[in-house]
Amino acid sequence: MDRDISYQQNYTSTGATATSSRQPSTDNNADTNFLKVMSEFKYNFNSPLPTTTQFPTPYSSNQYQQTQDHFANTDAHNSSSNESSLVENSILPHHQQIQQQQQQQQQQQQQQQALGSLVPPAVTRTDTSETLDDINVQPSSVLQFGNSLPSEFLVASPEQFKEFLLDSPSTNFNFFHKTPAKTPLRFVTDSNGAQQSTTENPGQQQNVFSNVDLNNLLKSNGKTPSSSCTGAFSRTPLSKIDMNLMFNQPLPTSPSKRFSSLSLTPYGRKILNDVGTPYAKALISSNSALVDFQKARKDITTNATSIGLENANNILQRTPLRSNNKKLFIKTPQDTINSTSTLTKDNENKQDIYGSSPTTIQLNSSITKSISKLDNSRIPLLASRSDNILDSNVDDQLFDLGLTRLPLSPTPNCNSLHSTTTGTSALQIPELPKMGSFRSDTGINPISSSNTVSFKSKSGNNNSKGRIKKNGKKPSKFQIIVANIDQFNQDTSSSSLSSSLNASSSAGNSNSNVTKKRASKLKRSQSLLSDSGSKSQARKSCNSKSNGNLFNSQ
């Protein structure tokens, strides 16, 4: 007995192991079968809920059957097959389709009333072959127009759209027949023109779209010469969608004119202008900075009577004013007093109004010269902390130094140059000439301990006196830098002058006028290296010497 029991136990254990070894193979087969079924029928998956609707494709049996019925009805009414789906879908919906849809809606409402209000409509839709009312209309058009726009269907993916346009298996669906690209092109046509076209041919109301009208419509862009084709065909979408009309003709109906009117707010219009349109902006010049620069080159006149002294500090800190009579800039009374233009000098105790501007351009001319191209004597010297600044890392101390420590700013702040506080000797930068200031003779005195810049010059005083004559003699483009005041042109020019005067003394009274003219032409330029007192003394001594030489020669 014990042997039999042990034998049975061993048999059952071996059988269990055999079944356990066979079990994974059955599970794998089930998984592969399920995956195969899901991969094959993933596009034909039927939901158990009857309320879910499946949007048809051009290859579905419902859509194909409906199109076959539609073609059968149209062929029965029109034996000559003069109706075109292109004109039907793009311009006017057919009247018979609207009537058929209304009849179908009435029949379905009667069926729902006959079934009773207790039964929900979801239970009644057990047949999946039944089609919806809006099965051929896109959802956006359903929300806007209801069921008034037939013959529209939904394509689920771009691959289906490509196959639908090119590789359609059915004979009735191809690129030239009911493409979804042509169905949204619906335009409201002239109802009066449509009525005229129908009343002219009362016997052919069903044959509204004939072959002649269709050919004229497609060939002449809706502009038919014959009077019988006028009416609904005179207003076609082809003349409005033409790309040549859209891009090449600046008509008032072009989309570029209406692009700015899409947004009613100024902020929206600014955004639209910043984004830009695909159309050319011919009237807008992209180089407005050069235009402003050319306008700023005009001469400056003094018109101190028209401006009060109260507004003198606030004028020309914005855009310079212009007079009505002459298109010239107006100078303030402060300019006449200080003999310095406010275009080249900022007001004291004023915030930095400069900064990066989108219209700033780089002018590679003789006006703006970089600091590396100047002479060694005109390069600004650093302050007492120059050794510490140069030795240490610039990136570590850049933000601690302040704005006055930046040596090469594109728009330097002039407040530091005009500041009266002499407690801290800051780095002085030569003031760059602004737009229109072509005669700024600014320089740096390297000998003076205060390391300041002298702004008064001979040309600046001449500019403040009145308007410069355009036809006059142009000033010299070079400047004499004087190293010693007492020996101004003594070795070369004075000796040549005395020799010329001695040679011309025997000529008589006729040559005396020439020497006077020559002596009057020898005008010394104002020295930037001396103070005002030394300048006046040097001028007096120079005049006395020249007068003495002239007196001796005479």
Curated annotation (Swiss-Prot):
The modification Phosphothreonine is found at T319. Residues 98-113, 448-465, 493-513, 525-536 have a biased composition (Low complexity). Phosphorylation of Thr-319 by CDC28 is required for the interaction with FKH2 and recruitment to promoters. Induction: During S phase of the cell cycle. Expression is cell cycle regulated by HCM1. Residues 1-31, 98-117, 410-475, 493-554 are annotated as: Disordered. The keyword DNA-binding does not apply. One of its GO terms (cellular component) is cytoplasm. It is found in: Cytoplasm; Nucleus. Residues 411-427, 539-554 have a biased composition (Polar residues). It comes from the Eukaryota. Residues 466-475, 515-524 have a biased composition (Basic residues). GO terms for biological process: G2/M transition of mitotic cell cycle; positive regulation of transcription by RNA polymerase II. GO terms for molecular function: transcription coactivator activity. Keywords: Activator, Cytoplasm, Nucleus, Phosphoprotein, Transcription, Transcription regulation. Forms an activator complex with FKH2. Transcription activator involved in G2/M transcription through its association with FKH2. Present with 779 molecules/cell in log phase SD medium. This is Nuclear division defective protein 1. It comes from Saccharomyces cerevisiae (strain ATCC 204508 / S288c) (Baker's yeast). The gene is NDD1.
